[in-house]
Curated annotation (Swiss-Prot):
One Pfam entry name: Ribosomal_S20p
Protein name (Swiss-Prot/TrEMBL): Small ribosomal subunit protein bS20
Classification lineage: Bacteria, Pseudomonadati, Pseudomonadota, Alphaproteobacteria, Rhodobacterales
Record flagged with keyword rRNA-binding: yes
Xref: NCBIfam families: S20
Similarity comment: Belongs to the bacterial ribosomal protein bS20 family.
Gene (name only): rpsT
Any one GO cellular component localisation term in the record: small ribosomal subunit
Chain spans, region Disordered: 1-23
Source organism (scientific name): Cereibacter sphaeroides (strain ATCC 17025 / ATH 2.4.3) (Rhodobacter sphaeroides)
């Protein structure tokens, strides 16, 4: 348990930051889920729109230190590829 005033304050700050980070991560997951649902529905326009709204949220997660840069880059790349494949008609 924190004993000194400084360590008590640090514990409070860490708890507050953890709550903010948890909320931000949850928000990002919600945007990703919307993209996944749009891809699953098969609607290229909806998928592209959902991806367009999700990308800034994911990038914000990187700048705020919630997610790692490479993780977000990988997720964005994979989602963009899936949306692109959805919008291009399948070659027979």
């Amino acid at each position: 348990m924190a004993n000194s005033p400084q360590s008590k304050k640090r514990a409070r700050q860490a708890e507050a930051r953890a709550a903010v980070n948890k909320a931000r991560r949850s928000r990002i997951r919600t945007f990703l889920r919307k993209v996944e649902e749009a891809i699953a529905s098969g609607d290229p326009a909806a998928a592209a729109a959902a991806l367009k709204t999700a990308q800034p949220e994911m990038a914000r997660g990187v700048t705020k230190g919630v997610l790692h840069k490479n993780t977000v880059a990988r997720k964005m790349s994979r989602l963009a590829h899936r949306v692109k494949v959805l919008s291009v008609p399948a070659a027979a």
